[in-house]
Regions:
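Signature of N-terminal electron-transfer/Fe-S-associated modules in redox systems
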Residues: 1-150
Length: 150
C-alpha cells in the first residue's frame, strides 16, 4: 500500500493496519470475522477480507484499497465508482467500499460478467440496509456502458 513498510505486532490484521496506522478510512470494519465483506481489499489481484489477513503475511504483496481506485492526480472516480453514484448503488455506505472492491476484482478477471456472476461474486458482501440489488444494478450499468463503448 503506497510502499509503506514497518514493524507490526504479529497479531495485527491488515484491516487494523490500514485504518489505524495508515489512516485509510474508506475501508470499513464490520464483523471482524470475514463474513460481511465490509473490509474487502484487493490483494495480489484477488478480493480478500482484510480482517482475516495478518499484516505480517502481506510482505511483498500488492494491496489496493478503495482510496487507490480514484485518479491520484485529479481525484476523479473510476467508471465503476461513478456508476454507483449515478445509480444510487449505496445507502449508508458501510458496505459500499467492500462491494466496489469485490466488483473491481471480478471485473479485472472477467470484464463483462453476467448478472449471475456479479451476484455470485458479491455473495460474501452483506448490505445491512437491504439495497444489495442497487449495487448489482450499478455494476451491471457499468458493464453495459463499457460494452456500448467498445
Amino acid at each position: 500500500v503506497g510502499n509503506n513498510r514497518g514493524d507490526m505486532p504479529q497479531s495485527e490484521t491488515l484491516a487494523h493496519t490500514l485504518r489505524d496506522r495508515l489512516h485509510l478510512m474508506g475501508l470499513k470494519l464490520g464483523c471482524g470475522q470475514g463474513a460481511c465483506g465490509c473490509c474487502t481489499v484487493i490483494m495480489d489481484g484477488r478480493a480478500v477480507t482484510s480482517c482475516m489477513v495478518l499484516t505480517m503475511d502481506c510482505d511483498g504483496s500488492s494491496i489496493t484499497t478503495i482510496e487507490g481506485l480514484a485518479d491520484p492526480e485529479t481525484g476523479d472516480l473510476t467508471g465503476l465508482q461513478q456508476a454507483f453514484v449515478d445509480n444510487c448503488g449505496f445507502q449508508c455506505g458501510s458496505c459500499t467500499s467492500g462491494i466496489i472492491m469485490t466488483a473491481r476484482a471480478l471485473l479485472d478477471e472477467k470484464p463483462c460478467p453476467t448478472e449471475e456472476e456479479v451476484r455470485d461474486a458479491l455473495a460474501g458482501n452483506y448490505c445491512r440496509c437491504g439495497t444489495h440489488y442497487t449495487a448489482v444494478e450499478s455494476i451491471m450499468a457499468y458493464v453495459e456502458k463499457r460494452r456500448s463503448e467498445e
